[in-house]
């Protein structure tokens, strides 16, 4: 499964996301004049790495609606959905793990992780199929269904969906017929639930570390984590953190 394009589904006031991936002639000229070839290559690589398509979601009707807006850009191929407020870091890319599971099962795949039962109201929660065995050391799990943000007493498992999916194009038909659900939104989980009656759906436990960068604490934690692993600033960050901890 080879990705040739990135489809950004955005809304009003989010041009900065589009601009980030666009060419930056002024910045490139500045870096070239300074002789900063290393950073010049990085800036140019961002705009050259993939074909970028932007789609506007004019109404905020949920994740399922956002995915449906990308239908014409995606076409009739399987595709990945990546939510930017979930950052997963590991030796092996989390999305690559999902793609492997998709190619093995020829179905749709959702990324999952264990969550406290009381947190079920914040996640889509999966229902495990007890009649089919898990594979790959228990990391790839056949599913019977999904429920969006159930009450703890109603949650079918303690596995919550993280913001990574690989879906077949059949999902678009289901999204078109999906009624507004939780929060009066078109829920992607409801459409995947309908899809489960026709093709395999599996959950995939990721092997890395996950950060919720949609929260202030998660955003700060993710930045510190990535800074500590950075080849240029990691050493200085560790020294500074050690010094701060000793002060306290």
Language-model-derived ranges and their functions:
Residues 19-25:
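Glycine-rich loop at the start of a catalytic domain that most often binds anionic cofactors/ligands
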Residues 7-10, 112:
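Short internal beta-strands
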Residues 237-248:
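Intrinsic disorder at enzyme termini
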Residues 16-17, 191:
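Phosphate- and divalent-cation-binding pockets in alpha/beta enzyme and binding domains
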Residues 27-32, 37, 43-130, 167-169, ...:
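Conserved beta-loop-beta/alpha segment of the NTase-like Rossmann-fold superfamily
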Residues 11-14, 21:
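Residues in the short beta-alpha loop(s) of Rossmann-like NAD(P)-binding domains
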Residues 80, 95-103, 131-238:
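Catalytic-core segments of class I nucleotidyltransferases/pyrophosphorylases
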Residues 1-2:
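Short, small-residue-biased leader/transition segments that mark boundaries at the very start
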């Amino acid at each position: 499964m080879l990705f040739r394009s990135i489809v950004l589904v955005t809304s009003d006031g989010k041009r900065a996301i589009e601009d980030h991936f666009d060419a930056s002639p002024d910045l490139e000229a500045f870096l070239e004049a300074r002789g900063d070839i290393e950073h010049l290559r990085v800036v140019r690589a961002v705009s050259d790495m993939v074909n970028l398509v932007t789609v506007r979601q004019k109404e905020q009707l949920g994740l399922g609606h956002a995915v449906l807006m990308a239908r014409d850009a995606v076409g009739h191929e399987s595709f990945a959905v990546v939510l930017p407020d979930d950052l997963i870091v590991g030796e092996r890319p989390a999305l690559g793990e999902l793609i492997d599971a998709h190619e093995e099962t020829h179905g749709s795949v959702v990324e999952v992780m264990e969550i406290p039962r009381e947190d079920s109201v914040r996640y889509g929660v999966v229902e495990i199929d007890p009649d089919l065995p898990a594979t790959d050391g228990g990391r790839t799990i056949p599913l019977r269904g999904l429920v969006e943000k159930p009450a703890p007493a109603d949650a079918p498992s303690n596995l919550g969906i993280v913001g990574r999916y690989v879906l077949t194009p059949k999902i678009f038909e289901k999204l078109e017929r999906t009624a507004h659900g939780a929060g009066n939104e078109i829920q992607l989980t409801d459409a995947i639930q309908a899809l489960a009656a026709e093709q395999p759906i599996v959950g995939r436990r990721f092997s890395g570390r996950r950060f919720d960068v949609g929260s202030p604490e998660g955003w700060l934690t993710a930045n510190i984590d990535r800074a500590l692993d950075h080849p240029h600033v990691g050493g200085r960050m560790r020294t500074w953190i050690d010094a701060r901890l000793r002060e306290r």
